Amino acid sequence: MSEALLNAGRQTLMLELQEASRLPERLGDDFVRAANIILHCEGKVVVSGIGKSGHIGKKIAATLASTGTPAFFVHPAEALHGDLGMIESRDVMLFISYSGGAKELDLIIPRLEDKSIALLAMTGKPTSPLGLAAKAVLDISVEREACPMHLAPTSSTVNTLMMGDALAMAVMQARGFNEEDFARSHPAGALGARLLNKVHHLMRRDDAIPQVALTASVMDAMLELSRTGLGLVAVCDAQQQVQGVFTDGDLRRWLVGGGALTTPVNEAMTVGGTTLQSQSRAIDAKEILMKRKITAAPVVDENGKLTGAINLQDFYQAGII
Protein backbone atom coordinates (compact mmCIF):
# COMPACT_ATOMS: atom_id res chain seq x y z
CA MET A 1 0.00 0.00 0.00
CA SER A 2 2.77 2.45 0.92
CA GLU A 3 4.56 1.88 -2.38
CA ALA A 4 1.33 2.39 -4.31
CA LEU A 5 0.73 5.70 -2.53
CA LEU A 6 4.27 6.87 -3.23
CA ASN A 7 4.02 5.91 -6.88
CA ALA A 8 0.71 7.76 -7.25
CA GLY A 9 2.18 10.87 -5.65
CA ARG A 10 5.31 10.77 -7.79
CA GLN A 11 3.30 10.18 -10.94
CA THR A 12 1.16 13.22 -10.17
CA LEU A 13 4.19 15.42 -9.66
CA MET A 14 5.89 14.16 -12.83
CA LEU A 15 2.79 14.79 -14.93
CA GLU A 16 2.35 18.30 -13.53
CA LEU A 17 6.02 19.12 -14.07
CA GLN A 18 5.83 17.82 -17.62
CA GLU A 19 2.88 20.05 -18.44
CA ALA A 20 4.40 23.06 -16.70
CA SER A 21 7.64 22.65 -18.66
CA ARG A 22 5.76 23.61 -21.84
CA LEU A 23 4.71 27.01 -20.52
CA PRO A 24 7.89 29.03 -21.22
CA GLU A 25 7.73 28.42 -24.97
CA ARG A 26 4.18 29.79 -25.06
CA LEU A 27 5.17 33.22 -23.80
CA GLY A 28 5.15 35.62 -26.71
CA ASP A 29 3.35 38.67 -28.06
CA ASP A 30 0.19 38.06 -26.04
CA PHE A 31 2.16 37.83 -22.79
CA VAL A 32 3.94 41.09 -23.58
CA ARG A 33 0.62 42.70 -24.52
CA ALA A 34 -1.01 41.55 -21.28
CA ALA A 35 1.90 42.84 -19.20
CA ASN A 36 1.85 46.22 -20.96
CA ILE A 37 -1.91 46.58 -20.51
CA ILE A 38 -1.46 46.01 -16.78
CA LEU A 39 1.53 48.36 -16.61
CA HIS A 40 -0.45 51.16 -18.24
CA CYS A 41 -3.62 50.48 -16.28
CA GLU A 42 -4.65 53.59 -14.34
CA GLY A 43 -7.03 51.65 -12.12
CA LYS A 44 -6.95 48.15 -10.69
CA VAL A 45 -6.61 44.66 -12.07
CA VAL A 46 -9.84 42.77 -11.37
CA VAL A 47 -9.28 39.01 -11.37
CA SER A 48 -12.24 36.68 -11.81
CA GLY A 49 -12.87 32.97 -12.25
CA ILE A 50 -15.12 30.12 -11.19
CA GLY A 51 -14.34 26.95 -9.25
CA LYS A 52 -10.66 26.02 -9.03
CA SER A 53 -9.87 28.86 -11.43
CA GLY A 54 -11.42 31.21 -8.90
CA HIS A 55 -9.30 29.84 -6.06
CA ILE A 56 -6.15 30.31 -8.13
CA GLY A 57 -7.41 33.73 -9.20
CA LYS A 58 -7.57 34.89 -5.59
CA LYS A 59 -3.92 33.99 -5.18
CA ILE A 60 -2.95 35.76 -8.41
CA ALA A 61 -4.81 38.91 -7.31
CA ALA A 62 -3.03 38.79 -3.96
CA THR A 63 0.36 38.35 -5.65
CA LEU A 64 -0.26 41.30 -7.95
CA ALA A 65 -1.40 43.49 -5.06
CA SER A 66 1.64 42.67 -2.94
CA THR A 67 4.10 43.32 -5.77
CA GLY A 68 3.03 46.80 -6.82
CA THR A 69 -0.10 46.27 -8.91
CA PRO A 70 -3.41 47.18 -7.22
CA ALA A 71 -5.68 44.17 -7.71
CA PHE A 72 -8.64 42.37 -6.19
CA PHE A 73 -10.75 39.28 -6.90
CA VAL A 74 -14.43 39.31 -7.86
CA HIS A 75 -16.47 36.11 -8.19
CA PRO A 76 -18.37 36.05 -11.52
CA ALA A 77 -21.69 35.29 -9.82
CA GLU A 78 -21.21 38.23 -7.45
CA ALA A 79 -20.19 40.41 -10.38
CA LEU A 80 -23.52 39.66 -12.06
CA HIS A 81 -25.42 40.57 -8.92
CA GLY A 82 -24.05 44.03 -8.29
CA ASP A 83 -20.28 43.79 -8.04
CA LEU A 84 -19.81 44.84 -11.66
CA GLY A 85 -20.40 48.28 -10.20
CA MET A 86 -16.99 47.99 -8.52
CA ILE A 87 -15.26 47.80 -11.90
CA GLU A 88 -14.48 51.10 -13.63
CA SER A 89 -13.46 51.99 -17.16
CA ARG A 90 -9.86 52.53 -16.12
CA ASP A 91 -9.62 48.99 -14.71
CA VAL A 92 -8.46 45.79 -16.39
CA MET A 93 -10.17 42.42 -15.98
CA LEU A 94 -8.19 39.18 -15.98
CA PHE A 95 -10.68 36.33 -16.40
CA ILE A 96 -9.57 32.76 -15.75
CA SER A 97 -11.50 29.89 -17.32
CA TYR A 98 -9.86 26.74 -18.63
CA SER A 99 -12.72 26.03 -21.04
CA GLY A 100 -13.18 29.69 -21.89
CA GLY A 101 -16.89 29.05 -22.11
CA ALA A 102 -18.20 29.81 -18.62
CA LYS A 103 -21.84 30.82 -19.04
CA GLU A 104 -21.33 33.92 -16.88
CA LEU A 105 -19.11 35.30 -19.64
CA ASP A 106 -22.15 35.73 -21.91
CA LEU A 107 -23.35 38.45 -19.55
CA ILE A 108 -20.03 39.80 -18.31
CA ILE A 109 -18.28 40.43 -21.64
CA PRO A 110 -20.94 42.85 -22.99
CA ARG A 111 -20.84 44.82 -19.73
CA LEU A 112 -17.06 45.11 -19.96
CA GLU A 113 -17.35 46.29 -23.56
CA ASP A 114 -19.93 48.89 -22.52
CA LYS A 115 -17.41 50.32 -20.04
CA SER A 116 -14.42 49.94 -22.41
CA ILE A 117 -12.69 47.73 -19.85
CA ALA A 118 -9.74 45.78 -21.24
CA LEU A 119 -10.22 42.01 -20.92
CA LEU A 120 -7.30 39.62 -20.50
CA ALA A 121 -7.86 35.87 -20.73
CA MET A 122 -6.12 33.00 -19.02
CA THR A 123 -7.53 29.88 -20.66
CA GLY A 124 -6.75 26.45 -22.02
CA LYS A 125 -8.82 27.17 -25.13
CA PRO A 126 -7.44 30.26 -26.90
CA THR A 127 -10.18 30.13 -29.57
CA SER A 128 -13.01 29.95 -27.02
CA PRO A 129 -15.50 32.82 -26.56
CA LEU A 130 -13.27 34.16 -23.76
CA GLY A 131 -10.14 33.94 -25.88
CA LEU A 132 -11.76 35.63 -28.86
CA ALA A 133 -13.10 38.50 -26.75
CA ALA A 134 -9.82 39.21 -24.96
CA LYS A 135 -7.14 41.70 -25.92
CA ALA A 136 -4.48 39.18 -24.86
CA VAL A 137 -4.67 35.43 -24.26
CA LEU A 138 -2.41 33.52 -21.89
CA ASP A 139 -2.45 29.86 -22.90
CA ILE A 140 -2.53 27.49 -19.89
CA SER A 141 -3.59 24.39 -21.84
CA VAL A 142 -2.46 20.89 -20.84
CA GLU A 143 -2.40 17.63 -22.76
CA ARG A 144 -3.68 15.80 -19.71
CA GLU A 145 -4.56 16.42 -16.10
CA ALA A 146 -2.58 14.58 -13.44
CA CYS A 147 -5.85 13.16 -12.12
CA PRO A 148 -6.03 9.40 -12.98
CA MET A 149 -9.58 9.98 -14.25
CA HIS A 150 -8.46 13.04 -16.24
CA LEU A 151 -11.20 15.01 -14.49
CA ALA A 152 -9.97 16.94 -11.43
CA PRO A 153 -8.13 20.18 -12.31
CA THR A 154 -4.53 19.42 -11.37
CA SER A 155 -2.00 20.08 -14.11
CA SER A 156 -4.17 22.92 -15.39
CA THR A 157 -4.36 24.65 -12.00
CA VAL A 158 -0.58 24.41 -11.63
CA ASN A 159 -0.21 25.99 -15.07
CA THR A 160 -2.66 28.73 -14.11
CA LEU A 161 -0.78 29.55 -10.93
CA MET A 162 2.57 29.57 -12.72
CA MET A 163 1.29 31.78 -15.53
CA GLY A 164 -0.09 34.19 -12.95
CA ASP A 165 3.24 34.29 -11.16
CA ALA A 166 5.08 34.84 -14.46
CA LEU A 167 2.82 37.77 -15.31
CA ALA A 168 3.06 39.31 -11.84
CA MET A 169 6.84 38.99 -11.70
CA ALA A 170 7.30 40.44 -15.20
CA VAL A 171 5.14 43.44 -14.31
CA MET A 172 6.88 43.84 -10.96
CA GLN A 173 10.32 43.99 -12.57
CA ALA A 174 9.11 46.40 -15.24
CA ARG A 175 7.86 48.71 -12.48
CA GLY A 176 11.23 48.62 -10.72
CA PHE A 177 9.46 47.33 -7.61
CA ASN A 178 12.11 46.63 -4.96
CA GLU A 179 12.51 45.14 -1.48
CA GLU A 180 11.50 48.32 0.31
CA ASP A 181 8.37 48.64 -1.82
CA PHE A 182 7.52 45.04 -0.94
CA ALA A 183 8.07 45.71 2.75
CA ARG A 184 5.62 48.63 2.67
CA SER A 185 2.92 46.15 1.67
CA HIS A 186 3.97 43.82 4.49
CA PRO A 187 4.63 46.15 7.46
CA ALA A 188 3.69 43.53 10.06
CA GLY A 189 5.91 40.82 8.64
CA ALA A 190 9.55 40.02 9.27
CA LEU A 191 10.56 41.69 6.00
CA GLY A 192 8.74 44.86 7.02
CA ALA A 193 10.60 44.94 10.31
CA ARG A 194 13.91 44.41 8.54
CA LEU A 195 13.49 46.96 5.78
CA LEU A 196 11.16 49.67 7.08
CA ASN A 197 12.61 50.34 10.53
CA LYS A 198 15.19 53.10 10.81
CA VAL A 199 17.62 53.41 13.68
CA HIS A 200 15.66 56.33 15.14
CA HIS A 201 12.57 54.10 15.40
CA LEU A 202 14.37 51.72 17.78
CA MET A 203 16.97 53.80 19.62
CA ARG A 204 16.88 54.83 23.26
CA ARG A 205 16.20 58.49 23.89
CA ASP A 206 16.46 61.24 26.49
CA ASP A 207 17.42 59.93 29.95
CA ALA A 208 18.01 56.45 28.55
CA ILE A 209 21.00 57.73 26.56
CA PRO A 210 24.27 56.99 28.40
CA GLN A 211 26.41 60.12 28.11
CA VAL A 212 28.93 62.25 29.97
CA ALA A 213 30.80 65.44 29.15
CA LEU A 214 34.44 65.52 28.08
CA THR A 215 35.24 67.14 31.43
CA ALA A 216 33.68 64.26 33.42
CA SER A 217 35.80 61.84 35.42
CA VAL A 218 36.20 58.10 34.97
CA MET A 219 34.07 57.77 38.13
CA ASP A 220 31.26 59.78 36.48
CA ALA A 221 31.44 57.56 33.40
CA MET A 222 31.45 54.40 35.55
CA LEU A 223 28.30 55.55 37.35
CA GLU A 224 26.64 56.30 34.01
CA LEU A 225 27.59 52.83 32.77
CA SER A 226 25.95 51.34 35.82
CA ARG A 227 22.83 53.52 35.52
CA THR A 228 21.99 52.65 31.91
CA GLY A 229 23.42 49.14 31.61
CA LEU A 230 24.08 49.57 27.90
CA GLY A 231 27.77 48.70 28.08
CA LEU A 232 29.01 52.08 26.87
CA VAL A 233 28.84 55.80 27.51
CA ALA A 234 29.03 58.47 24.81
CA VAL A 235 31.57 61.16 25.67
CA CYS A 236 30.43 64.49 24.21
CA ASP A 237 31.74 68.04 23.92
CA ALA A 238 29.71 71.14 24.75
CA GLN A 239 27.96 70.97 21.35
CA GLN A 240 26.84 67.36 21.96
CA GLN A 241 29.28 66.09 19.35
CA VAL A 242 30.45 62.55 20.18
CA GLN A 243 34.21 62.63 20.75
CA GLY A 244 34.55 59.05 21.90
CA VAL A 245 33.00 56.20 23.85
CA PHE A 246 33.81 54.72 27.24
CA THR A 247 32.90 51.05 27.46
CA ASP A 248 32.88 48.30 30.07
CA GLY A 249 36.08 47.07 28.45
CA ASP A 250 37.70 50.50 28.72
CA LEU A 251 36.82 50.59 32.42
CA ARG A 252 38.32 47.16 33.10
CA ARG A 253 41.50 47.99 31.24
CA TRP A 254 41.78 51.32 33.07
CA LEU A 255 41.39 49.77 36.51
CA VAL A 256 43.72 46.84 35.77
CA GLY A 257 46.31 49.35 34.60
CA GLY A 258 46.05 51.21 37.91
CA GLY A 259 44.24 54.25 36.54
CA ALA A 260 42.58 56.61 39.01
CA LEU A 261 38.82 57.11 39.05
CA THR A 262 39.33 60.86 39.34
CA THR A 263 41.13 61.03 35.99
CA PRO A 264 39.25 62.85 33.19
CA VAL A 265 37.36 60.29 31.11
CA ASN A 266 38.86 61.58 27.88
CA GLU A 267 42.14 59.98 28.93
CA ALA A 268 40.53 56.56 29.31
CA MET A 269 37.95 56.54 26.51
CA THR A 270 38.16 55.08 23.02
CA VAL A 271 38.62 58.14 20.82
CA GLY A 272 36.09 58.35 17.99
CA GLY A 273 34.48 54.97 18.28
CA THR A 274 31.59 53.65 16.22
CA THR A 275 28.49 55.81 15.85
CA LEU A 276 25.32 55.06 13.91
CA GLN A 277 23.26 57.48 11.84
CA SER A 278 19.69 57.96 13.09
CA GLN A 279 18.27 57.82 9.55
CA SER A 280 20.07 54.61 8.59
CA ARG A 281 18.10 51.43 8.03
CA ALA A 282 18.04 49.41 11.22
CA ILE A 283 19.12 46.24 9.39
CA ASP A 284 22.23 48.02 8.05
CA ALA A 285 23.08 49.42 11.49
CA LYS A 286 22.76 45.99 13.07
CA GLU A 287 25.15 44.57 10.47
CA ILE A 288 27.70 47.26 11.37
CA LEU A 289 27.59 46.23 15.03
CA MET A 290 27.88 42.56 14.11
CA LYS A 291 30.78 43.12 11.73
CA ARG A 292 32.72 45.20 14.27
CA LYS A 293 31.87 42.75 17.06
CA ILE A 294 30.38 45.36 19.36
CA THR A 295 27.04 45.23 21.14
CA ALA A 296 26.02 48.91 21.27
CA ALA A 297 26.73 52.34 19.82
CA PRO A 298 25.71 55.99 20.18
CA VAL A 299 23.33 57.35 17.54
CA VAL A 300 23.95 60.72 15.90
CA ASP A 301 22.02 62.95 13.52
CA GLU A 302 23.22 64.26 10.16
CA ASN A 303 25.28 66.92 11.98
CA GLY A 304 27.01 64.43 14.25
CA LYS A 305 25.00 65.46 17.32
CA LEU A 306 24.13 62.76 19.84
CA THR A 307 20.43 61.85 19.60
CA GLY A 308 20.22 58.34 21.01
CA ALA A 309 21.84 55.00 21.72
CA ILE A 310 21.08 51.44 20.66
CA ASN A 311 22.26 47.91 21.31
CA LEU A 312 21.78 44.54 19.63
CA GLN A 313 18.94 43.59 21.95
CA ASP A 314 16.92 46.53 20.64
CA PHE A 315 17.21 45.12 17.12
CA TYR A 316 16.28 41.61 18.20
CA GLN A 317 13.19 42.82 20.07
CA ALA A 318 12.03 44.54 16.87
CA GLY A 319 12.34 41.28 14.93
CA ILE A 320 15.52 42.29 13.12
CA ILE A 321 17.58 39.13 13.39
Swiss-Prot record:
NCBIfam families: kpsF, PRK11543.1. It comes from Escherichia coli (strain K12). It catalyses: D-arabinose 5-phosphate = D-ribulose 5-phosphate. ATP binds at G49, I50, G51, K52, S53, G54. GO terms for biological process: keto-3-deoxy-D-manno-octulosonic acid biosynthetic process; protein homotetramerization; single-species biofilm formation. Zn(2+) binds at H75. Substrate binds at residues 68-69, 75, 81, 107-116, 141-143, 215, 267. Keywords: ATP-binding, CBS domain, Isomerase, Lipopolysaccharide biosynthesis, Metal-binding, Nucleotide-binding, Repeat, Zinc. The gene is gutQ. Residues 34-177 form the SIS domain. GO terms for molecular function: arabinose-5-phosphate isomerase activity; ATP binding; identical protein binding; metal ion binding. Optimum pH is 8.25. Gene3D superfamilies: CBS-domain, Glucose-6-phosphate isomerase like protein, domain 1. Belongs to the SIS family. GutQ/KpsF subfamily. Its EC number is 5.3.1.13. Catalyzes the reversible aldol-ketol isomerization between D-ribulose 5-phosphate (Ru5P) and D-arabinose 5-phosphate (A5P). It appears that the physiological function of G-API may be to synthesize the regulatory molecule A5P, which in turn participates in the induction of the gut operon through an unknown mechanism. It is also able of sustaining the biosynthetic pathway of 3-deoxy-D-manno-octulosonate (KDO), a unique 8-carbon sugar component of lipopolysaccharides (LPSs). This is Arabinose 5-phosphate isomerase GutQ. The keyword Electron transport does not apply. CDD domains: CBS_pair_SIS_assoc, SIS_Kpsf. The record marks K52, E104, E145, H186 as: Catalytically relevant. Disulfide bonds: none annotated. InterPro entries: CBS_dom, CBS_dom_sf, GutQ/KpsF_isomerases, KdsD/KpsF-type, SIS_dom, SIS_dom_sf, SIS_Kpsf.
